[in-house]
Swiss-Prot record:
PANTHER family: METHIONYL-TRNA FORMYLTRANSFERASE, METHIONYL-TRNA FORMYLTRANSFERASE, MITOCHONDRIAL. The gene is fmt. InterPro entries: Fmt, Formyl_trans_C, Formyl_transf_N, Formyl_transf_N_sf, Formyl_transferase-like_C_sf, GART_AS, Met-tRNA-FMT_C, Met-tRNA-FMT_N. It comes from Listeria monocytogenes serovar 1/2a (strain ATCC BAA-679 / EGD-e). PROSITE patterns: GART. Keywords: Protein biosynthesis, Transferase. This is Methionyl-tRNA formyltransferase.
Length: 312
């Protein structure tokens, strides 16, 4: 049976691991160290570690694999293939070149578009109507390896980064399992990435999280769903942070200054730069838990003045 080392960390990686383990001999799982989570800073294992332990697979958690003694242990396993999915570290050539069939990665974009750590976020932020997953060779340069297979999936206005992560996680596992038989048999010729079409999905900055109400409504709508459920887009209300977790978009122009409020007893609408409307549905005022807008408008939101504007 084909011996595989799997490397991954978040929930996205779990379906890939479980599918691999159902058919192949996964001899080791490498994931990030346990990290403190939440206000109480409870030391929490990554989702992949939990899944690996349930499957009785040995787990490695080096802080930095490149300089870890565990690197030689992994090479000594003499695996036939290394598979990664959102592991979170650049891997050294000594490991990439050690398996018989090399090292491949499940990447959540249609490469060469969106190389980097936040491809799903950027597909939503940029208003794409489709994205997908790519199986590609691992090289030391970030997400630059030749492409082995690729599969597309639509993005709807109802999607956000969270829903797309779930869909792409399943799609990636399916594509990998469909690809591996021919790949291991040497029947697939990989395709180099077109350097003219390369784009990058770098980690989201704090500045990208802040809503600029002078921008068009569609752009703001894409920002909100592209940053939901993490790190979450925010604006300010009376100089205090105000997060918008979920919203809809109305392509009707009501007039009013950017950030102006149109509200009734149960709904809240905010004017964008082109006059179209953002309609928040789940929000989080400063110092409060997230809530639906109806709860906000029947509580603290009742005191909103028509002269109040978001972003001020």
């Amino acid at each position: 049976m084909t011996k595989i080392i799997f490397m991954g960390t978040p929930e996205f990686s779990v379906p890939v691991l479980t599918q691999l383990a159902s058919t192949y001999d996964v001899v080791a799982v490498v994931t990030q160290p346990d990290r403190p989570v939440g206000r109480k800073r409870v030391l929490t294992p990554p989702p992949v570690k939990k899944a690996a332990l349930e499957l009785a697979i040995p787990v490695y958690q080096p802080e930095k694999l490149r300089t870890s003694s565990e690197l030689e242990e992994l090479i000594a396993l003499e695996a036939d293939l290394l598979v990664t999915a959102a592991y979170g570290q650049i891997l050294p050539n000594s490991l990439l070149e050690s398996p018989k069939h090399g090292a491949i990665n499940v990447h959540a974009s249609l490469l060469p578009e969106y190389r980097g750590g936040a491809p799903v976020h950027y597909a939503l932020l940029d208003g794409k109507t489709e994205t997908g997953v790519t199986i590609m060779y691992m090289v030391e340069k970030l997400d630059a390896g030749d492409m082995i297979s690729q599969r597309k999936i639509p993005i709807t206005d109802e999607d956000n980064t969270g829903t797309m992560f779930d869909k792409l996680s399943i799609l990636g596992a399916e594509l990998l399992m469909d690809t591996l038989p021919d790949f291991l048999a040497g029947k697939i010729t990989a395709t180099p990435q077109d350097p003219e079409k390369v784009t990058f999905a770098r980690n989201i900055s704090r500045e990208q999280e802040k809503i600029d109400w002078t921008k068009p409504g569609r752009t703001i709508f894409n920002q909100i769903r592209g940053l939901s459920p993490w790190p979450v887009a925010y604006t300010t209300l009376e100089e205090k942070p105000f997060k918008i977790w979920e919203a809809t978009y109305e392509d009707t122009k009501e007039g009013g200054e950017p950030g102006a409020i149109l509200a009734d007893k149960t709904t809240l609408k905010i004017v964008a730069g082109d006059g179209t409307l953002i309609v928040p549905t789940v929000i989080q005022p400063a110092g409060k838990p997230k809530m639906d807008v109806h709860s906000f408008m029947t509580g603290a939101g009742r005191n909103l003045s028509k002269t109040t504007r978001f972003g001020e």
